[in-house]
Curated annotation (Swiss-Prot):
It is found in: Membrane. The keyword Transmembrane applies. This is Transmembrane protein 164. Belongs to the TMEM164 family. It comes from the Eukaryota. The keyword DNA damage does not apply. It comes from Mus musculus. It is a multi-pass membrane protein. Disulfide bonds: none annotated. One of its GO terms (biological process) is positive regulation of ferroptosis. Keywords: Membrane, Transmembrane, Transmembrane helix.
Length: 296
């Protein structure tokens, strides 16, 4: 018999999930909502998510066809430097740092037998960031970049309403905050590089709509089904987090509303911040420089 049987594999994936921690999982968490309410919410949200995906794809593909004749609809891109295309030192250092941070987080998941939590959206976005830093600029990287720009709202929620009651290992809590902070560092860095990492215009919400539909479809289909089968509260699809301000039987309805609003606007605010931060930093640096004295 193989040493790693099917049962040991399941134990390796979620055997360390302790239902005694509030909001972590277990039978009580899985039964937090009645099956009728869960089914009704899932049907409504999945239908809306599919409509959002179809509408967004239709407009994006139409814009792509219209853009073949010219680039007038594209935003102004950062002036490309002569060394554009070469791996910069800063990009490589950021990639190494992110890989080390995420590697430690993965190690914690293996050590605590909670590897299943790597399916949570923040970890998936971190993997997308590693790909963007490692992959040369290309059309595929541009698509992933535009999608992840509108998937960063989870990092804000994780920082404002942290769920850290299960992080008991040394430095596990610190890695939690560092990883979620890095979810903002990488996009802002890529925005400053420009080129293939140029977002859509601020008035264009099609990519935000597509990201919203994909995130809700992922949550109410894959994460919810897997959570019900394993009784693991993946991204709070079974029961609300202990820090949820909308704790109660309608927490998913509230979440669908405020997360739709956040997904549609949060990425735009990050883009706007990156546009303002660059000139602001340059202005502050110019202020710090002492004026040169003219010698007659």
């Amino acid at each position: 018999m193989s040493r790693y049987s099917y049962q040991s594999l399941l134990d390796w994936l979620y055997g360390g999930v302790d239902p005694s921690f509030a909001g972590n999982g277990g039978p009580d968490c899985a039964a937090f909502l009645s099956w009728q309410q869960r089914l009704l919410e899932s049907v409504v949200v999945l239908t809306l998510a599919l409509l959002e995906i179809l509408v967004a794809l239709r407009h994006i593909l139409r814009q792509k066809e219209d853009g073949r004749g010219g680039r007038s609809s594209q935003p102004q891109q950062v002036t490309q430097r002569p060394e554009e295309g070469k791996e910069s030192l800063s990009k490589n250092l950021l990639l190494v740092a992110l890989c080390l941070i995420f590697g430690v987080e993965v190690g914690f998941k293996f050590a605590t037998k909670t590897v299943i939590y790597l399916l949570n959206p923040c970890h998936l976005v971190t993997m997308m960031h590693i790909f963007l830093l490692a992959c040369p600029p290309c059309p595929g990287a541009t698509v992933i970049f535009k999608l992840q720009m509108h998937m960063l709202n989870g990092a804000l929620l994780a920082l404002l309403f942290p769920v850290v009651n299960t992080r008991l290992l040394p430095f596990e809590l610190e890695i939690y905050y560092i990883q979620h902070a890095m979810l903002y560092v990488v996009p802002v860095y890529l925005l400053w590089k420009g080129g293939a990492y140029t977002p859509e215009p601020l008035c264009n919400f099609q990519w935000a709509l597509l990201s919203t539909g994909l995130m809700f479809f992922y949550h109410f289909s894959f994460l919810q089904i897997l959570g019900l089968v394993t009784e693991v509260n993946l991204n709070n699809m079974l029961c609300p987090a202990i820090s949820d301000p909308f704790y109660g039987p309608w927490y998913r309805i509230w979440a669908s509303g405020h997360q739709t609003l956040m997904t549609m606007t949060h990425g735009k605010l990050v883009i706007l911040f990156s546009y303002m931060a660059g000139p602001l930093c340059k202005y502050l640096l110019d202020l710090l420089r002492l004026p040169a004295k003219k010698i007659d």
